[in-house]
């Protein structure tokens, strides 16, 4: 068991009780980027997964040892973000497989964004798992990706052996919508669109179709126990203005797995892409790989 207490360097530090020592040791080591930046110079090239009657998905794949790692991006984010690239460099350095991809309608993938939905992006994740990934996988989901990784673990329990959520936005857009005054909800329904303010979009807001919100409601998970039994690690910034950090506590409470850690960063925001945030993410992945490899052997 591990408890988390305030620490000047990290915002939170781990105090270990018993067997759970891997992450504690990782945090005490020198920062991972000091060695993985000089690792293998292997380049991943852009490829496309062709799917009958569905948009082709753009992806980059690094072949290597299992468990492999799959990065699932956030809402309207592409595969080239700082976290995805950092994980790829780390996987190169240790020889493990890695996949990053774009949702349909986003980035280099085919598809019409206006027709996209949580359900369709869920299918995208499963397509990557079924048709590209080989062997057991650790899923790393950022924001919306943290919601979709839970769905993937439920649908493919034999292949998904661990989850890492970064500012997991489970049920996010639906919860936000229903927190609005009833009059505003009706106005959005009549208008057919919700202009959601966001400092992370150059326009200053996201235009979310009402149909997207309505469809997303069919994929909510927090209303009942979540049948995920693998190890789960949930990282969240306490300065997150988009998805409150309490959401990760809700997810931790709802998943049935007994092996769940919630790790809070006191001064981190929703994106969690500062140097110390990336360090924590890489150490968490490293710890899970070590834990799962020990169990396997």
Curated annotation (Swiss-Prot):
Gene3D superfamilies: alpha/beta hydrolase. Transmembrane segments: none annotated. Inhibited by palmostatin-B. GO terms for molecular function: hydrolase activity, hydrolyzing O-glycosyl compounds; mycophenolic acid acyl-glucuronide esterase activity; palmitoyl-(protein) hydrolase activity. The active site is at 143 (charge relay system), 240 (charge relay system), 270 (charge relay system). Keywords: Hydrolase, Mitochondrion, Transit peptide. Residues 1-43 form a transit peptide. One of its GO terms (cellular component) is mitochondrion. It holds the Pfam family Abhydrolase_1. It is found in: Mitochondrion. Expressed in epididymal sperm but not in testicular sperm (at protein level). InterPro entries: AB_hydrolase_1, AB_hydrolase_fold, ABHD10_acyl-thioesterase. The keyword Hydrolase applies. Its main location: mitochondrion. It catalyses: S-hexadecanoyl-L-cysteinyl-[protein] + H2O = L-cysteinyl-[protein] + hexadecanoate + H(+); mycophenolic acid O-acyl-beta-D-glucuronide + H2O = mycophenolate + D-glucuronate + H(+). One of its GO terms (biological process) is protein depalmitoylation. Belongs to the AB hydrolase superfamily. Acts as an acyl-protein thioesterase that hydrolyzes fatty acids from acylated residues in proteins. Regulates the mitochondrial S-depalmitoylation of the nucleophilic active site residue of peroxiredoxin-5/PRDX5, a key antioxidant protein, therefore modulating mitochondrial antioxidant ability. Also catalyzes the deglucuronidation of mycophenolic acid acyl-glucuronide, an active metabolite of the immunosuppressant drug mycophenolate. This is Palmitoyl-protein thioesterase ABHD10, mitochondrial.
């Amino acid at each position: 068991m591990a408890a988390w207490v305030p620490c000047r360097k990290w915002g939170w530090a781990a105090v270990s009780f018993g067997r759970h020592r891997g992450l504690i040791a990782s945090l005490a080591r020198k920062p991972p980027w000091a060695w993985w930046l000089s690792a293998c110079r292997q380049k991943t090239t852009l490829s496309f997964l062709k799917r009958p009657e569905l948009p082709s998905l753009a992806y980059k794949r690094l072949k290597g040892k299992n468990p492999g790692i799959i990065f699932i991006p956030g809402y309207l984010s592409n595969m080239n973000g700082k976290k995805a690239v950092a994980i790829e460099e780390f996987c190169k350095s240790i020889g493990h497989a890695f996949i990053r991809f774009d949702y349909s309608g986003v980035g280099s993938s085919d598809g019409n964004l206006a027709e996209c939905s949580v359900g369709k992006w869920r299918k995208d994740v499963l397509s990557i798992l079924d048709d590209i990934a080989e062997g057991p996988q650790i899923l790393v989901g950022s924001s919306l990706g943290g919601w979709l990784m839970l769905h993937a673990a439920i649908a493919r329990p034999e292949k998904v052996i661990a989850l890492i959520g970064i500012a997991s936005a489970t049920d996010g857009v639906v919860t936000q919508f229903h927190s609005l005054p009833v009059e505003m909800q009706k106005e959005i329904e009549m208008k057919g669109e919700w202009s959601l303010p966001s400092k992370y979009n150059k326009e200053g807001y996201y235009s979310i179709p009402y149909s997207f919100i309505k469809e997303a409601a069919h994929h909510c998970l927090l209303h009942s126990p979540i049948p995920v039994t693998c190890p789960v690690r949930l990282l969240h910034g306490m300065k997150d203005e988009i998805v409150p950090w309490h959401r990760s506590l809700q997810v931790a409470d709802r998943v049935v797995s007994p092996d769940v850690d919630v790790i809070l960063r006191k001064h981190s925001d929703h994106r969690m892409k500062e140097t110390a945030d990336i360090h924590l993410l890489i150490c968490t992945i490293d710890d899970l790989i070590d834990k799962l490899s020990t169990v396997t052997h």
